Amino acid sequence: MPDIIIQPLNIADREWISQFMLEHWGSNKVVSRGVVYYPQDLPGFVATDESEKVGLVTYDITGSYCEIVTIDSVRPFSGVGTALIEAVKNIALQSGCKRLWLITTNDNMNALRFYQKRGFEIVAIHRNALDISRKLKPEIPLIGNEGIPLRDEIELEMILNDTASQ
């Protein structure tokens, strides 16, 4: 299998990102901690295998914090997600960020396992946060993975420093 190539997103990727978000997230709008994001307008990286796009990550840097807003791999367990996180981690370090963080939902057990295995720690559970998010994005379902009610945002972080080897 050929190597996965990680490249920065460019303006030509915007339409693809919008379509990808609609197909995989049901909307091209993302809500995190009460903030609405449009991933097609954010910086990020795309993972390709030959000419096929197999992964996407978008992020937002505010001050010394870098938030991973979206991350997706169409090939689970292939190293795509890990490579995308490493790309964002590197850009965060180059930008002087001290914290890499993200939000997932209480139903997303696969994400919780994935992030913790890569050095992220759970730092907060924002109870009933999705009630607020649904006011900004009504299409967020009430029931998530495995029939679990979607209620809470779970915040994970990785503290960054120049010698970080996580």
Where do the PLM segments sit?
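Conserved GNAT acetyl-CoA-binding A-motif
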Residues: 92-104
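Conserved N-terminal entry element of GNAT/NAT acetyltransferase domains
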Residues: 1-12, 154, 158-166
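Conserved acetyl-CoA-binding loop-helix of GNAT-fold acetyltransferases
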Residues: 78-90, 113-117
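Conserved acyl-donor/pantetheine-binding loop and adjacent beta-alpha core of acyl/acetyltransferases
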Residues: 28, 32-39, 56-58, 76, ...
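Acetyl-CoA-dependent GNAT
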Residues: 8-76, 82-86, 159-160
